[in-house]
């Protein structure tokens, strides 16, 4: 890898663009987005305007030639079958099996496969089918040449609500050094403790 990576990304299972909001605040640029839900696309368009980068459609049928070269692919795939509130059918379930559509996209990209992948989902993904689903997902990424790590972040660090989310970071070798930046961890000014500190400092 010569020189720093271009900080652009493709947002799969884009929804209304929450991943995009966070990454753009960190200096990343959107290059492509995809979601199957037309209603979410309408909200996405209302918020961001530039819909030329948004492809509405089933990820299982996505034409990968539409996807530009990017440094990062994000996937907040459906949690319905992984959540404790759901039927716990796991990655074989009708909704959460969309993860395999994402894996197929990465596979079909071949040499254009992004050097970094970020998955986001409920913490229940770790224990779905006694951990077999999480293991299978990591193995699938390993087979595509990615080294994988995972961590949980609680939303209480940012907003007045405790909500744990699982993040899986997958990278190809020697990629992190090419980013040429120091990771930063932000805490929202909207948290009650922050508000009180500013009001009564």
Feature locations, PLM:
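Conserved SAM-binding motif I beta-strand of class I
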Residues: 30-35
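Short alpha-helix immediately C-terminal to the canonical SAM-binding loop
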Residues: 38-42
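Class I S-adenosyl-L-methionine
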Residues: 62-72, 80, 84-201
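Conserved SAM-binding strand-loop segment of SAM-dependent methyltransferases
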Residues: 50-59
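Gly/Ala-rich phosphate-binding loop of Rossmann-like dinucleotide-binding domains
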Residues: 24
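Extreme N-terminal starter segment of soluble prokaryotic enzymes
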Residues: 4-8
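Class I SAM-dependent methyltransferase "Motif I" SAM/SAH-binding loop
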Residues: 11-16
